[in-house]
Amino acid sequence: MSYSSNTKNELARIEGEQSCCVRAELAALIRMSGTLQLVGSQKLNIKVTTENPAIARRLFKIIKKQYNIHAEVMIRRNARLKKNNYYLLVITHSMGSSEVLADLGIMKKVDDSFDITYRIPQELTQNRCCKRAYLRGAFLGGGSVSDPEKTYHLEFVTHHKELSEGLRDLINSFDLNAKVVERKGNYVVYLKEGDQVVDLLNIVGAHSALLDLENIRVYKEMRNNVNRIVNCETANLSKTVDASIRQIQNIQYIEGSIGINRLPDNLREVAELRVEYQDATLKELGEMINPPIGKSGVNHRLRKLDQIADRERGKSI
């Protein structure tokens, strides 16, 4: 099961919410994944679809608890897309769909017609707990979060621009930085940074998913740090090996041209040690010299040998 599905399963099992929060969550869930079906003069059915059985159970329970309505539940096979079954919950006009829509701020009856609104009702999101519940419902109905092993990305998808802007503003009321982009005829509200995704998961109550993400972040950071250290050490080792090869080649050239014995004692000693101990570091070479000298002193003498080799090569041209 995907990380996003696990997150939704966790959210679908949250219990003990107040009535105001249940209304906010239900309003968002119906708005994000529901459709309205006109079945007669001023008669509407509410249809909500989901592929997640935990969300279907939650919908059924909160509709029954809040409105004492036993929604009709059907299981459909998505044969065309060859995906999992999906669940269809229906609240018919006779069950009280109009009353539910009005209570959730989705529909208002004006004279002999319906006024469907796509704004987020302020009366449902006045309290901070209700704002959290609305975002939880929006995520259950039309949200997803990427596998944190790959990237940090959380989004809500809706057909309606006004709703997307309302979601963005509601998310940003928690000091986040959600943005809206149009994609293939839909409006996508998204967060991209790891810290922002963590904060949103905390807001909606997905604490287990949050901990999983944080554990993955720590692991990835440790892995990246190890890789950086290894790469740095590999690069340094490569430089050391290249320098050692160059120094030995220069010493061998000096031996073949003027002879190492003609070098000053301090340079001759370093040259002989460098050839004998080809894998030794500058520090180790310095400790072999009598009296011992530091890395900078060894490096200075080796550079002198490089200069002598270059000078002798110039004479042979």
UniProtKB/Swiss-Prot annotation:
Cited InterPro entries: Homing_endonucl, Sporu_reg_WhiA_N_dom, Sporulation_regulator_WhiA, Sporulation_regulator_WhiA_C, WhiA_LAGLIDADG_dom
Stored Pfam families: HTH_WhiA, LAGLIDADG_WhiA, WhiA_N
Annotation: DNA-binding region: 281-314
Cysteines engaged in disulfide bonds, as pairs: none
GO molecular function term, any single one: DNA binding
Keywords noted in UniProt: Cell cycle, Cell division, DNA-binding
BP term (GO), one: regulation of sporulation
HAMAP family: HTH_type_WhiA
Family: Belongs to the WhiA family.
Function (record text): Involved in cell division and chromosome segregation.
Descriptive protein name: Probable cell division protein WhiA
UniProt lineage: Bacteria, Bacillati, Bacillota, Clostridia, Peptostreptococcales
Gene: whiA
